[in-house]
């Protein structure tokens, strides 16, 4: 017999020890029978909240199902512990900034913090019953991962997919690093639309509206639409930029929107992507007036003969600021090998502001400079109007800072030239749900930039590259030898070069550059050419499943598909399963920065792991779910009911008895077995399509409606006897509960394991090949229909008793049933169970012709 009450804390502790000791989740390396899961490695950026647990449970439902189905499941756990998120955690933990402690000290601090965080993550994953094979654990800053990441980079470089170039990139002035297009988010800011007076060479005043007047010193042209009749007479002329008094051309271009603002637009080189497009199309000068700290950086040409230069190719080192250098310094860099020739440095026109205004603006943060420029324009009578507006601004996803566009040296991976091929790969993959594929396609079609993979940070995978200063090969890129990996170019030297002959690459890889090869990290190989010893590439690549949430389709999913295509002309996985978000009560994504997170430890302590998993399973694939305490309460009821139903069944069976349904011959027993046949079929098909929510729904409905509410009540009296009918009931009860436990096992692993151990076997319910098969059963259509008729009559009787305010056990003197006796009369076996459950002394059948299938029976009762 089971205990009176289920104690989840005691059971969870016992099961965790059991599972760890028995290695029930271990991957055995069966090449032809492996089911490989590409697991999302959590970012080491702080504590996990209930929203994280939500999505990790979804993957575990599939892992447990596939294991029980008979597959040798490869289910690793990784920790994404390199990169900017970890640096941010260190800065928050130690109340410092990376640049204050220096590179070496920061890296040391990062290692200390991630060790503590990883232990907390491990304990949480184990406490919620995630069935990882912990022997397959990996880390994105480990020696093996760094080696594979550097192999990946070298392979892409050798194939011409990775390149280094000076070009405008998205720059985060808070974290002081380049970021990729996929790492931006749009935020709404309060701002002002400022209409400013420009003057043409004929002293005609023209008005231009802008939200960024601080960029006036960078204005290199004014644009109008070629068909805008208001301004066609100005095309080809020049205008004077306010404050700077610089003359710039007025140019026609069809990308100008006639109905936006005044119809005139100033081009400021690096204001936005359209500015860059115009600069390149019309061969305009380049002016860089914002530095990497997000401050105004202006250079006066008064009394200065030489020009300011910026490099467009070659090596960029710390002696070169974001605003360029003088021609003398450019020549010096050429001699040192920083670039191949002086023609690779482009002159930048400096501002012609008066020195007093320049000195006042120089060094200000962008927002402060904007405010002061507006004041100066007002003082000079050059501001027509300033209107308050709300508008969308591109910001860094992590820091939240508004982005600038700066030309700097970065490493890139080609994406734009391979759009069509990547779209083909996307279509080859099976998307669950299928509509999520469209998100990926829209993202790829909208790409405007190649993937910038270099970051100006410290704690990450270094690029295995140096730049030669040797005479005759100045600026040459030197890559590490594969056998020398992993390397740190700031400490190691390339073969055949001295320290004086090279400049090490100081950047680190974007953390997505490593996360995008998680299938290969698990395989210990990038492809068949680049691998570690004892790799398992041929066994587990490509993976069977990638599970992730929808907001990283544009990053993790896209980059992983891109790299697998480049490395092996392959998909990284056959299926991708997309989870929605767990939303807070305010219907916003849970986020520590928003202050709306819920700590999983509190929920686990209150309800237990199975209830938390039940809550997670009640969300449909790809659909955002609002956190609901009510779902936890329903889950708790289910766990309690499963325990109590099992207690009842245990009264009619011997411990660990042999399962058999050979004697199950009574109609209602064959009815429940036929219903069980269908639910096994339905749940299996749902889980094969990764539809865990639908699978749980089918199992739960069967358990509550068919098994508990109907079958247990119908056979209760019969199970207490000693006849053949009793044996039929006992065998059916024991068998059906056994299957129910196995069906619930992927979702409720703890309580099912405990009951299974107590009643059926010392082996784990989660063992390989323990998923129930409908082939064990025989579907009996006659018994199912007969049983459904019993349930229909029983429900009518229950309603009549309720309407008469008597208990369901109240004795019925006579039960009178009208039906079409030629086809709807119950057989004797079914009638016996009905008579017992409704407590009727006699049943009288009467012929009746009824119209609809839903109203087969008219029931009347005589009560005592």
UniProtKB/Swiss-Prot annotation:
> Which segment of this protein is annotated as the motif 'KMSKS' region?
589-593
Q: Which InterPro entries match?
A: aa-tRNA-synth_I_CS, aa-tRNA-synth_Ia, Anticodon_Ia_Val, M/V/L/I-tRNA-synth_anticd-bd, Rossmann-like_a/b/a_fold, tRNAsynth_Ia_anticodon-bd, Val/Leu/Ile-tRNA-synth_edit, Valine-tRNA_ligase_type_2
Instruction: Using the UniProt record, name the top-level EC class of this enzyme in a single word.
Output: ligase
Q: Please provide the record's keywords in A-Z order.
A: Aminoacyl-tRNA synthetase, ATP-binding, Cytoplasm, Ligase, Nucleotide-binding, Protein biosynthesis
* Recorded catalytic activity of this chain's protein: tRNA(Val) + L-valine + ATP = L-valyl-tRNA(Val) + AMP + diphosphate
Which biological process terms from the Gene Ontology are attached to this UniProt entry? valyl-tRNA aminoacylation
Q: Which PROSITE patterns match?
A: AA_TRNA_LIGASE_I
Q: Can you name one GO molecular function term for this protein?
A: aminoacyl-tRNA deacylase activity
Keyword DNA damage set for record? no
Chain positions of motif 'HIGH' region: 42-52
User: Where this protein primarily resides, as one coarse class?
Assistant: cytoplasm
Question: Can you say where in the cell this protein is located?
Answer: Cytoplasm
Residues given in the record as ATP binding sites:
592
Q: What is its EC number?
A: 6.1.1.9
Q: List the disulfide bonds.
A: none
Q: Which domain of life is it from?
A: Bacteria
Its family remark reads: Belongs to the class-I aminoacyl-tRNA synthetase family. ValS type 2 subfamily.
Quote the NCBIfam families the UniProt record gives. PRK13208.1, valS, WPE_wolbac
Quoted from the entry, the domain comment is: ValRS has two distinct active sites: one for aminoacylation and one for editing. The misactivated threonine is translocated from the active site to the editing site.
Q: How does it assemble?
A: Monomer.
Q: What does this protein do?
A: Catalyzes the attachment of valine to tRNA(Val). As ValRS can inadvertently accommodate and process structurally similar amino acids such as threonine, to avoid such errors, it has a 'posttransfer' editing activity that hydrolyzes mischarged Thr-tRNA(Val) in a tRNA-dependent manner.
| HAMAP family documented for this protein | Val_tRNA_synth_type2
Protein's UniProt name: Valine--tRNA ligase
Species annotation = Wolbachia pipientis wMel
